[in-house]
A protein has these predicted regions:
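Positively charged n-region of N-terminal signal peptides that target proteins for export
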Residues: 1-4
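Catalytic cores and adjacent binding grooves of peptidoglycan-active enzymes
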Residues: 98-100, 113-187
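Active-site acidic/histidine clusters and adjacent loop/turn architecture
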Residues: 22-85
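Extracellular/periplasmic catalytic domains that process cell-envelope and extracellular macromolecules
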Residues: 21-24, 104-110, 163
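Mid-length scaffold segments of soluble, non-membrane domains
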Residues: 83-118
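Surface-exposed patches in mature extracellular/periplasmic domains of secreted proteins
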Residues: 65-76, 104, 169-176
Length: 187
């Protein structure tokens, strides 16, 4: 059943034919608490190698009533990562390159996930010195010293659970700060 659902979801994705060789994707149905405090069931497409970790992490987040606005496949946003992030959509698989490079992102292998990306933007300095914020609507949440809801920090349950499961956090990177991003790049 999960394979059939995955096939149907990917049917509408322009990136389905770009899936890297040797990558097996899985579809997870993830219970979560939305920003209105209601239980929702989201759909997460990920690499089969991290499926069990993600199920355990999100089960703990759900039990703790940790708010996640939405969890939908990137195909619901016409494979547009910026559009998905602006909608504060938590997602995993997205066939794309790392911004500003020709290198495949770990999202393209389903080994990376972005959680509540609007409130936890990716911030990078481009070669011309300008600052790139993704999503572009995440500018109010760049200053991590400010107090605001849904912010991932090292004290946050979301951070702790992903780290306990062996993920690396983009908020710890030196040059780019990708506060929404967790990955297992070495699988």
């Amino acid at each position: 059943m999960r394979r059939i659902l995955l096939s149907l979801l990917l049917l509408y994705s322009v990136t389905v034919f770009c899936q890297p060789a040797g990558v097996t994707l899985d579809t997870l149905h993830i219970k979560h608490i939305d920003f209105q405090g209601k239980t929702q069931t989201g759909v997460l497409i990920c690499n089969q190698k991290i499926a069990d970790d993600l199920q355990e992490i999100f089960a703990e987040l759900y039990k703790a009533k940790y708010p996640i606005e939405r969890i939908r496949p990137i195909s619901e946003y016409q494979d547009d990562d910026e559009r998905s992030m602006r909608a504060n959509n938590t997602s995993c698989y997205c066939y794309r390159v790392v911004e500003g490079s020709k290198t495949l992102s770990n999202h393209a292998r389903g080994l990376a996930i972005d959680v509540n990306p609007l409130y936890n933007p990716c911030v990078r300095r481009k070669k011309d010195g300008t600052i790139l914020i993704q999503p572009d609507t995440g500018k109010p949440y760049v200053n991590r010293a400010k107090a605001f809801k849904y912010k991932i920090t090292k004290d946050d349950l979301c951070y702790r659970l992903f780290i306990q499961h062996g993920f690396k956090w983009g908020g710890n990177w030196r040059t780019v700060k990708d506060y929404q991003h967790f990955e297992k790049p070495d699988l």
